[in-house]
From Swiss-Prot:
Name of this protein: 60S ribosomal subunit assembly/export protein LOC1
Region of interest (Disordered), residue spans: 1-57, 145-199
Compositional bias per record (Basic residues), positions renumbered to this chain: 7-16, 168-183
Name of encoding gene: LOC1
Location of this chain's protein in the cell: Nucleus, Nucleolus
Keyword Nucleus: yes
Length: 199
């Protein structure tokens, strides 16, 4: 007959045993089925940048400033014509500009606006929010002045046309009156009555 186990021996036996942790997913049949159908996640093709690369990029940013990402345009935005398309009658297809718009040499408003906007696109200079806001405000002001000038030119053109129409109308009116007077004079002349004599 085997002797009785001491408490320390019992404790040592339970402690030495390796503990097994099994996930509930594998014990539950429904969860196990769902796990079998789950798609296997692939590793991303783009590798994560190393610390060295990150430091290098940060140094470049400190020296030269952040580079603006070039905008990529879709085919719809570029208005590229689609080939072999049926021509719909009566529908005008949008085309590009037919000619260049030249700016007058002494048109300072437009020239200043163009200089400011072109510089904005091509210069990769980092500026404070206040400076940028100030520059954008200047561009907006120039655009506003340009619009006002265009409206003024439009109004002047319209006024000239109105004056021309009024002149034409007044000339036509005077002609009508003159013709009416002439007709009245002709009516006032007494008609010679015809006399018939019998022999």
């Amino acid at each position: 007959m085997a002797g009785k186990q001491t408490k320390t021996a019992k404790r040592a036996k339970t402690q030495n045993r390796t503990r097994e942790v099994t996930s509930e997913v594998f014990q539950d049949s429904q969860a196990r089925n769902q796990l079998a159908n789950a798609p296997k996640v692939e590793k991303p093709s783009a590798r994560k940048a190393t610390k060295r690369q990150v430091k290098k990029e940060q140094a470049v940013v400190r020296l030269y400033g952040t580079r603006k990402k070039e905008k990529t345009y879709s085919e719809k935005e570029l208005n590229i014509p689609t080939l072999n398309r049926a021509i719909v009658p009566g529908v005008k297809i949008k085309t590009g500009k037919k000619g260049k718009k030249f700016v007058d040499d002494h048109d300072l408003l437009t020239l200043n606006r163009l200089i400011k906007t072109i510089g904005d696109k091509n210069d990769e200079v980092t500026e404070s929010k206040l400076e940028k806001a100030k520059r954008l405000e200047e561009i907006r002001e120039l655009k506003k002045q340009e619009l006002e000038r265009k409206e003024q030119a439009k109004k002047e053109k319209l006024d000239d046309k109105m004056d021309e129409l009024k002149r034409k109308a007044s000339v036509a009116r005077t002609l009508r009156r003159k013709n009416k007077r002439h007709e009245k004079k002709l009516e006032d002349v007494p008609k010679s009555s015809k006399k018939v004599s019998f022999a």
